[in-house]
UniProtKB/Swiss-Prot annotation:
Pfam families: Ribosomal_L9_C, Ribosomal_L9_N. Belongs to the bacterial ribosomal protein bL9 family. One of its GO terms (cellular component) is ribonucleoprotein complex. SUPFAM superfamilies: L9 N-domain-like, Ribosomal protein L9 C-domain. This is Large ribosomal subunit protein bL9.
Length: 189
C-alpha cells in the first residue's frame, strides 16, 4: 500500500514522501496513529493544503523535544536490582523499566521511545539511547547495581564484578610456597 507520510518516520522517509509499505503496517500503525494518509488524489490535495500547518506542528513538537533533550542529555539514572556474585541480574532491565525510572524523575517518556536492542542482564553502567522525536535523540546513562552504595561506587569507575569488589580481597596469584613439590607428594604416598 502506498501512503503519504505526515511526519518523519525513521527508516521510511520524510514528511510528504509517498512510500510503499506493507498493508498491515499501514492499517494497524501508520493510519490509526495519524502518521500517514492513503496515497490517492484526494489525500494528496488534502496534504498539500495542510502542509504548512503540519510542518509548523512538527517544528513545535521538535522544539519541545529538544528542550527536554537538553535537560535529559548526559543524565544518569540508578536502577537497583538483585544480582548474583558475578554481576548477572536475576531478571533483566527492559525498556519499560528504564522509561518508568526516567518518568519518576519528572520527564515524560513512553517505553517505545527507549531504544534498547535487548534487555540488560548485568550490573554496571549502560548507555541507552532515547528518541524523543524522530529528529531528536539523546543518550542517558543507566547505572544498574545491587544497592545505591554500589551504584555510587560504579559511578566512580569501580568494577563490581571482580573478586576484589565481591569479597573485599585483592586478586593475587598464589605463590609457589603454597604448592608442595611433586617429590614430597610421592614420598607421602
Amino acid at each position: 500500500m502506498e501512503v503519504i507520510l505526515l511526519e518523519r518516520i525513521g527508516r521510511l522517509g520524510q514528511m510528504g514522501d509517498t512510500v510503499k509499505v506493507k498493508d498491515g503496517y499501514a492499517r494497524n500503525f501508520l493510519l490509526p496513529q495519524g502518521k500517514a494518509l492513503r496515497a490517492n488524489e484526494a489525500n494528496k490535495k488534502k496534504f498539500e493544503g495542510q502542509r504548512a500547518q503540519l510542518e509548523a506542528q512538527n517544528l513545535e513538537r521538535k522544539n519541545e523535544a529538544q528542550a527536554v533533550a537538553d535537560k535529559l542529555n548526559g543524565e544518569s539514572f540508578i536502577v537497583v536490582r538483585s544480582a548474583g556474585e558475578t554481576g548477572q541480574l536475576y531478571g533483566s532491565v527492559s525498556t519499560r523499566d528504564i522509561a518508568e525510572i526516567i518518568t519518576a524523575d519528572g520527564f515524560t517518556l513512553h517505553r517505545n521511545q527507549v531504544e534498547l536492542n535487548h534487555p540488560i542482564k548485568t550490573i554496571g553502567l549502560h548507555e541507552v539511547s532515547v528518541s524523543l522525536h524522530p529528529e531528536v535523540q539523546v543518550k542517558v546513562m543507566v547505572n544498574i547495581a545491587r544497592s545505591t552504595e554500589e551504584a555510587e561506587r560504579q559511578a566512580k569507575g569501580e568494577d563490581l564484578t571482580s573478586i576484589e569488589a565481591i569479597y573485599g580481597i585483592e586478586e593475587q596469584p598464589l605463590s609457589e610456597e603454597v604448592f608442595d613439590d611433586e617429590d614430597e607428594a610421592e614420598d607421602q604416598a
